[in-house]
Amino acid sequence: DGIAAMLIEPMMGNCCAISATTEFVQLARRLCDQYGVLLIIDEVKTGFRVAKGGIQSLHNVKPDICTFAKAMANGYPIAAIGGREEVMRTFRPGGAAHGGTYTAHSVSMAAAERCLQILDETPALATLAAYGESLKSGMKQILDRRGIVHSFSGHPSMFGLFFAPQPPNDYRAWKKSDYSFYDKLARHMQDNNIIVEPDSREPLFMCEAHDQSCLADTLRAFETSVDLTLEQVEEERRAS
């Protein structure tokens, strides 16, 4: 009786894109229905990126409330909340209050309208996923040739790279892992003109503007950076 809602992020946007299973997400839906609890899904990073219907559509689950931002306007500052009609009608004078930092930002609204139109009328999301698959495949070949154990988590359009046989299944597992190889690798990538997040928790995000030339540049820098990281690790081992 004391629980109003369950908030879940089926793909962790700030931790390697660690993903919940469909069974878990659907169980969350059933439990919320059973106990009269609202199910809220955080789609701030996955919405309009992994699928037109967001991560919820991939799990075939409808939340009571969901949140969107980021890809919705392709980088312009915007955020949105949506949900079941019964829930959304509570946001009214005399009902639940709601304010927004980006409320009535006309430029962002125009950008979002155009962005959603493009997503609806073109294969942009399929292009993102295909690019991500190619990037993962190239990375895998480079790492396999050097015998470096690794795994990927998340969706092709938004994935994490993890240096272990299996990706972590929650934040605590990531926290206990040795992510120092990625940290070193990321800095070498930056030195080779590929800007990646230096924190291994942040996934790699695909962009529809990236073409095959960008892919080739990224993989060349990745291969060079892997070798530099291996050299750095060996130097540190000898010095210790």
Outline where the language-model segments fall.
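Conserved N-terminal phosphate-binding loop of PLP-dependent enzymes in the Aspartate aminotransferase
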Residues: D1-S240
